[in-house]
């Protein structure tokens, strides 16, 4: 694997039924769009304990999908670091297993990495995103983005969009993250923005119309407040 290879990293934890079929279908679409490129698909099982995972797992065994597993559950950040560390592609993209963003959006990330030679491409949600989002999630997202915009000097306040890509320079930065759960995205953008030599692009992307949102865990949100504070402290004391 090398210059023409993209590693697609997909973390999974207690997925809904049909998750494996979605991965196979969407990865097939990407391969059709870029027939001259090799795609390394890596699924990282973050300690799933559901039968849905086991049922889908068997469907991946006969396909060109690499599966990494561990227990117990450690968080999305740790799952992605595990997958990124194991990846062998020159470029890396990560998203969620339900592929919540359009294939065209993923293609924009790929083109920015391949054609524009960007080190890191950060997907940000287009304005119509909030038309699809449940009220509680919408409110929490807007409050979070307000604090990011007001308190941190980084290139975007939409750090939690679940579609990002990077080359080997960006990979090295990503592997420096330490947050195990959701604010690893913010930490990644924060670390990248501190190095002015890194070529970062902010790319607007679109949500698929039929995306189903999971219920938000308020306990995790409380815990992530501490991680936000740690990043904020680092931004001021170095």
Model-derived features: positions:
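Hydrophobic helical membrane-anchoring modules
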Residues: 1-6, 17-18, 177-238
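Short beta-strand/loop segment that forms part of the nucleotide-sugar
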Residues: 26, 35-48, 68-70
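A conserved acidic beta->alpha catalytic loop
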Residues: 45-53, 99
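Catalytic metal- and UDP-sugar-binding loop of GT-A-like glycosyltransferases, i.e.
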Residues: 70, 95-97
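Short aromatic/hydrophobic "clamp" motif used to bind/position activated sugar donors
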Residues: 92
